From Swiss-Prot:
Domain Ubiquitin-like, chain residue ranges per copy: 46-122
Protein's job: Co-chaperone that regulates diverse cellular pathways, such as programmed cell death and stress responses.
Record-annotated membrane-spanning stretches: none
UniProt organism field: Arabidopsis thaliana
Domain of life (superkingdom): Eukaryota
Subunit and interaction comment: Binds to the ATPase domain of HSP70/HSC70 chaperones. Interacts with HSP70-1.
Name of the protein this chain belongs to: BAG family molecular chaperone regulator 4
Length: 269
């Protein structure tokens, strides 16, 4: 008995010689494409194992080769408990961007990455200091005192020039300069300052104290002009020469010329 090709495709011989009709699901399974073994292995190869070093700790991660370094950070957050913003990932000594893919950077199976934890305290120190209204007010007050002290400093310099030049300066000039300096010192003492304003105030206090010391020294020199022994000796010598020379600052002439003059007068007589 002859069967056409269609009928032959609907029957199959089972072990033992039994002829049975082929089931639909078996027939449909014959038409399903078989999975390419190469593509299956390629899909398996998409997952790689990398080692991430964090100080003395090492973490093994199984991750897709197409993942990014940001994905690695997320995986490390779960293992270490650190914040992703604190982590820096280095591969081959170069810090990698979060959006960069592992495969594009050359990361392969068994590659090693290094994680560095950023010092958050250092990052906070680098931020510009917050200037409050109170700080601005303190800085302005210290600057105002600085301007007044500049004027008083010029006055002290003028007093020093006068004293060094031998000018007799009234005592009240030194007392007035000292009083004005003390007023500015009291102003600084009443300024509540922090940060840069505090440093500036401290420097200005030291400056005023130095000027006060200079005024006291000038006043002492003016009250006792011979306090400088070298200058006193020079003035005394000049006065002695003036007395001995009878109206001349030069020392008196030697006795021998006087004898000659006497002899001339005798000859004249």
């Amino acid at each position: 008995m002859m069967h056409n090709s269609t009928e032959e495709s609907e029957w199959e011989v089972r072990p033992g010689g039994m002829l049975v009709q082929r089931r639909d699901d078996a027939a449909s399974s014959d038409h399903k494409p078989l999975q390419d073994p190469d593509s299956a292995s390629a899909a398996f190869a998409q997952t790689i194992r990398i080692t991430v070093s964090h100080g003395s700790s090492h973490h093994d991660l199984h991750i897709s080769a197409h993942a990014t370094f940001g994905d690695v950070k997320k995986a490390l957050v779960q293992k270490t408990g650190l914040e992703a913003s604190e982590l820096k990932i280095l591969f081959r000594g170069v810090e990698r961007d979060d959006a960069e893919q592992l495969q594009a950077a050359g990361v392969k199976d068994a590659s090693k990455l290094v994680v560095v934890v950023e010092d958050t305290n250092k990052r906070v120190e680098q931020q510009p200091p917050v200037v409050t209204k109170e700080m601005e007010k303190a800085i302005a007050a210290v600057n105002a005192v600085t301007g007044e002290v500049d004027k008083l400093s010029d006055r002290v310099v003028a007093l020093e020039v006068a004293v060094n030049g031998g000018t007799q300066v009234a005592v009240r000039e030194f007392d007035m300069a000292a009083e004005l300096l003390m007023r500015q010192l009291l102003k600084l003492d009443g300024i509540e300052a922090e940060g840069d304003a505090k440093v500036q105030r401290k420097a200005e206090v030291r400056r005023i104290q130095n000027l006060q010391e200079a005024v006291d020294k000038l006043k002492a020199r003016c009250s006792n002009p011979f306090v400088d022994q070298s200058k006193a000796a020079a003035v005394s010598t000049e006065w002695e020469s003036f007395g001995n020379g009878v109206g001349s600052l030069n020392p008196p002439p030697p006795a021998s010329p006087s004898a000659n003059v006497t002899q001339d007068w005798e000859k004249f007589d």
